[in-house]
Structures are given as structure tokens and as C-alpha cells.
């Protein structure tokens, strides 16, 4: 694996030190542990997910400071990952636009000096239009709903293939797999999970 981007939910730079190179861009979304920082100056995020319903979550702010999204903003951990998400979504939107234009352009046979031109010059064969594909590798993350807002932005894209690695004692051990599936239901809902784990729209693979 030679990743272009790494979104770290960890507080250390272990991956960067052991496997990293200068061509990889990192985003420590939960902050980074550094020896010269203390409890007052560190930017480490320790919090909970949004547990309130949509109609009250922006009104009931009693426990706002404990929520992860608040701490990310307050501690300035950054949001480079949003640029990566935009790149994924914009690439797919451009692909859909080109496909719609190609399908809407009806081929017309033209005649000139007894020579036949089978297609208009502006016609684009839909089969020649390629959708930009991305692969998301997930290592060592429980997919807990506390990170739902971020994980969903990446996983729920039709041009993203998600490969989730999980620990097992042997080939038949599915204890961790069961927990991951349960957490994914909380992230995207059962219908979306079913669609993405089988059939023509499969985008999620457990490894």
C-alpha cells in the first residue's frame, strides 16, 4: 500500500516514522501527542459523539464541550480531510455530468459528398468515460459511532472502495467482524450497509 493521504485517529506519529514518506499527506484529526506539550497546551481530542436528535442538538448545548466536533474546532486540530472528501465527491460529480451529457447526445448520421460520417464530431462514447476510483484502507479502528461524522463522509461514496482490516484468532473467528458490522449500521443505516456489502453496488470488503 502506498497511500496518498493518511487520516490518523491515533495520537502518535508511529505510521509516519515507520512507514511514511514525503509523498504522503497526514491529518491528525484527534490531535497529536508531543513531548513539549502539557495538559493545558496539548491539542488531543477526547470526547463523545452527537447523541441528540437533529431538532434539539443545536439548542441543548449543556454538554457541548465534551463532543468531539467541538473539541476539534476548539483545539484547532485542522480539517484537511474535508479537502480530500471534496476531491472524491467533485471527481464523481464530474463523471456523472459527462455521462449524462454523453447519453443525452443522440448519434446522427451525416452525409457529405456521398461520404457518410457515422457520428457527430462532438459525440462521446459513454464507455470511454472513466470514473475516478479511490481506495480507503481502514486499520485498527473500531468504527465506533463517535467518529461517525467523519467515517461516513469517506465510506458512503460510490467511487470509493473500502477495505476494512480486522483482527481474528483464526479463519473462523468473527467476533470482531460482528462488532464492526454493528457499528457500521450506526454509521450509515442497515439499508445502505446491505447495498454496499453485496451485489452490483458492493463497495465494502472485510479483510
Annotate each PLM feature.
Residues 1-90:
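Extended, H/D-rich, highly charged conserved domains that either
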Residues 22-23, 100, 112-207:
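SIR2/sirtuin-family catalytic core signature
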Residues 53, 64-66, 90, 104-105, ...:
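A generic signature of intrinsically disordered, low-complexity regions enriched in glycine/proline
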Residues 72-127, 145-146:
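A Trp-anchored, charged/polar loop motif used as the substrate-binding/catalytic surface
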Amino acid at each position: 500500500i502506498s497511500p496518498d493521504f493518511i487520516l490518523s485517529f491515533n495520537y502518535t506519529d508511529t505510521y509516519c516514522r515507520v512507514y511514511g514518506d514525503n509523498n504522503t499527506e497526514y491529518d491528525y484529526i484527534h490531535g497529536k501527542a508531543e513531548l513539549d506539550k502539557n495538559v493545558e497546551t496539548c491539542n488531543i481530542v477526547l470526547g463523545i459523539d452527537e447523541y441528540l436528535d437533529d431538532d434539539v442538538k443545536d439548542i441543548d448545548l449543556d454538554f457541548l464541550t465534551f463532543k468531539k466536533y467541538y473539541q476539534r474546532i476548539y483545539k484547532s486540530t485542522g480539517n484537511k480531510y474535508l479537502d480530500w472528501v471534496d476531491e472524491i465527491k467533485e471527481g464523481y460529480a464530474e463523471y456523472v455530468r459527462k455521462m449524462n451529457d454523453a447519453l443525452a447526445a443522440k448519434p446522427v448520421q451525416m452525409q457529405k459528398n456521398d461520404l457518410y460520417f457515422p457520428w457527430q464530431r462532438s459525440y462521446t462514447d459513454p464507455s470511454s468515460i472513466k470514473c475516478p476510483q479511490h481506495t480507503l484502507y481502514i486499520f485498527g479502528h473500531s468504527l465506533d459511532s463517535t467518529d461517525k461524522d467523519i467515517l461516513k463522509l469517506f465510506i458512503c461514496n460510490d467511487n470509493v472502495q473500502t477495505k476494512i482490516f480486522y483482527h481474528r484468532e483464526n479463519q473462523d473467528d468473527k467476533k470482531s467482524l460482528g462488532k464492526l458490522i454493528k457499528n457500521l449500521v450506526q454509521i450509515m443505516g442497515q439499508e445502505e450497509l446491505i447495498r454496499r456489502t453485496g451485489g452490483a453496488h458492493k463497495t465494502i470488503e472485510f479483510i
